[in-house]
Amino acid sequence: RQRQMCIRDSVRIAFIREKIINHFNINPSDENPFNKISLLDVGCGGGLLCEPMSKLGANVTGIDIVEKNIKTASAHAEENKLPIKYQVNTVEELATKKTKYDVILNMEVIEHVSDVSLFIKSCSHLLSKDGIMIFASLNRTLTSYGLAIIGVEYILGWLPRGTHDWNKFITPDELKVLFKSNQLKICLLYTSDAADE
């Protein structure tokens, strides 16, 4: 499982890096290419995405509602001398402040929130005018039920049973409506289980 997670994370990091570089027309050969980028990682967990973004020079803030995750992430960042700002917080609470971010990473979080509309609205308030939000979620299909719930939770036991509620998974069409109602433009939409839609 550890090796699979590392491969998945390295692919994800490369994808995020490429999208940020293209969006802001950054020279990838610069020593700290993201040094003018403010980045928010929503549901940052242990900081697996925050740390590589910080190493690229971004001014990184990571938020999570689980205090244990923030403590783990903070300790690891301190150990590696990375100036990442971690806090126990929600996007809904953070959106009440005046802070804006050039980049928001929103990876597999929406399927765990109770008010999806408020969540997307809060994210849109936090995103700077010319910013980019990179979003990943589980599509509500039979494939996702089989893989994310039956496979990961029940057969492999990688996550505790009940971690995911299939009814809270979101379809691309539902996501499009939410984004449009919050003046968020979709630049790229990719789904890996298109045969199930």
Residue ranges and their predicted role:
Residues 167-182, 189:
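Short alpha-helix
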Residues 8-35:
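Conserved alpha-helix/loop element of class I SAM-dependent methyltransferases that forms part
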Residues 8, 141-163, 192:
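Alpha-helical membrane-targeting segments
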Residues 2-9, 190-197:
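Conserved small/polar residues in nucleotide/adenosyl-binding loops
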Residues 137, 157-174:
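Acceptor-substrate binding/catalytic loop of class I
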Residues 27-145, 172:
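Conserved SAM-binding loop
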Residues 20, 24, 77, 179:
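Conserved hydrophobic residues forming the short capping helix/wall of the S-adenosyl-L-methionine
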